[in-house]
Amino acid sequence: MALRILFVEDHTHSRQTVSRLLRHFHYDVVAAPDYRTASALLDKWQFDVLLSDIRLPDGDGWNLVTVAKSKQPLVAIALTGLGTGKDEKPGLSCGFDHYFVKPLDFYRLRAILRGIVSRHSE
């Protein structure tokens, strides 16, 4: 089963690179550059995973995860440049299940995604 991932990242190069890597490992990736686009996609499609930057040009990932989880059950992963320990706690308390500080540790992300696939397969 291929996970459908909504990847929200405003930085074009990062969005393209991470999307390509995820597709290489056979994940179904839909990429959005901002909050508004991501919210519209959440209304249109069902996702297994939300992978979102925290700082977006028209909103923030903290609010997006709250909206996303009110619309559908999914695993939410924060990807952010906010790298202090004090930033992780609010991210997890607002609904993110995992918190990554940039640069992305792709091996750790793949391990988490494999775990999600395993749970979906049971």
At which residue positions do the language-model features occur?
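Conserved acidic carboxylate
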Residues: 9
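C-terminal output helix
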Residues: 104-114
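Acidic catalytic/metal-coordinating carboxylates
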Residues: 34, 60-63
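Acidic, metal-coordinating helix/loop segments flanking the phosphotransfer/catalytic sites
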Residues: 31-49, 89
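Two-component/phosphorelay signaling modules centered on CheY-like receiver
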Residues: 12-30
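Alpha4 helix (beta4-alpha4-beta5 surface) of REC/receiver domains from two-component response regulators
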Residues: 63, 83-99, 111
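Active-site residues of response regulator receiver
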Residues: 53, 80
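Short amphipathic alpha-helix used as the core "switch/output" element in two-component signaling
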Residues: 62-73
